[in-house]
Amino acid sequence: MKRVFLWLIFVLAFHKLLAEKIGDIASVVGVRDNQLIGYGLVIGLNGTGDKSGSKFTMQSISNMLESVNVKISADDIKSKNVAAVMITASLPPFARQGDKIDIHISSIGDAKSIQGGTLVMTPLNAVDGNIYALAQGAIVSGNSNNLLSANIINGATIEREVSYDLFHKNAMTLSLKNPNFKNAIQVQNTLNKVFGNKVAIALDPKTIQITRPERFSMVEFLALVQEIPINYSAKNKIIVDEKSGTIVSGVDIMVHPVVVTSQDITLKITKDPLNDSKNTQDLDNNMSLDTAHNTLSSNGKNITIAGVVKALQKIGVSAKGMVSILQALKKSGAISAEMEIL
């Protein structure tokens, strides 16, 4: 026990040199959220609810009234103050009976707005068909741009718990959020160095099986494991939001020399110095841009995604055009990184 904590103190003292904690890059298999869903009614709407043409809404109103001993045919209901909605929620791990969770409500009929209404008691089911929570509450005006959906903070009460016996377990499995052979071995070796050999074994690039040392309970063991710093190798990734034009990438993602054409735009990327001084603009990091010939030079240095984006902005390329060029760079092999388009 003493050796473990001394090692942890030593590592944590140099945490600035390390990228992540194991708990940040890996999750415990089986310890996860469970999705809940339910169908219900929002009442008290000021004429903005579903119209009588929404047969399922009128039938639901009839069923609700019948449950309180009021019998009326769905065909006789003409109310516009009620809207049919779907309710979704996430049941967190280890949630206990009586705990509150947030819910999200969305209209499924032809209502104009559900703002200002009240969700009547609605059971929320999991995929196994069991009821795990009951939702109910007033809908407070939130997003003025979307009147047909809303959130209710603490809008549901947990009625059934997901049983999970963590205390008596001797072995668990860690799942890396981003599978990587190097990271899996790194986690394995780090845990074995801290707790002793054969505590951890990497089964594949994503999965590490860990066995609890006898001197710890599983809760204590996992608490220690999640706090251990580790050198984390992340894949290069570029995220592009085409609508807003936002581009997120690592600062050191390099772009190899290439000529790329997309739509009406041609961009030449080179390490050679530029000759046309009249049309050359100096950018950051020793880069230069020939605006007449759309040529970007790094003057012998490495060119990064950040430099390419800045050059495209100088040329006046639209957000959509930037996305096209970045995709073309990826396809040509000039970029060694994953790309995600939002």
Swiss-Prot record:
Broad class of where this protein is predominantly found: periplasm
InterPro entries linked to this entry: Flag_FlgI (IPR001782)
GO CC list: bacterial-type flagellum basal body, distal rod, P ring; outer membrane-bounded periplasmic space
UniProt subcellular location: Periplasm; Bacterial flagellum basal body
Lineage: superkingdom: Bacteria
Pfam families: FlgI (PF02119)
Signal peptide: 1-15
Keyword list, A-Z: Bacterial flagellum, Periplasm, Signal
Record GO terms (molecular function): structural molecule activity
Entry's Gene Ontology BP terms: bacterial-type flagellum-dependent cell motility
Subunit record text: The basal body constitutes a major portion of the flagellar organelle and consists of four rings (L,P,S, and M) mounted on a central rod.
General function of this protein: Assembles around the rod to form the L-ring and probably protects the motor/basal body from shearing forces during rotation.
HAMAP family named among the record's database cross-references: FlgI
PANTHER family, sorted: FLAGELLAR P-RING PERIPLASMIC PROTEIN FLGI (PTHR30381), FLAGELLAR P-RING PROTEIN (PTHR30381:SF0)
Entry's family note: Belongs to the FlgI family.
Name of the protein in its database record: Flagellar P-ring protein
Provenance organism: Helicobacter pylori (strain ATCC 700392 / 26695)
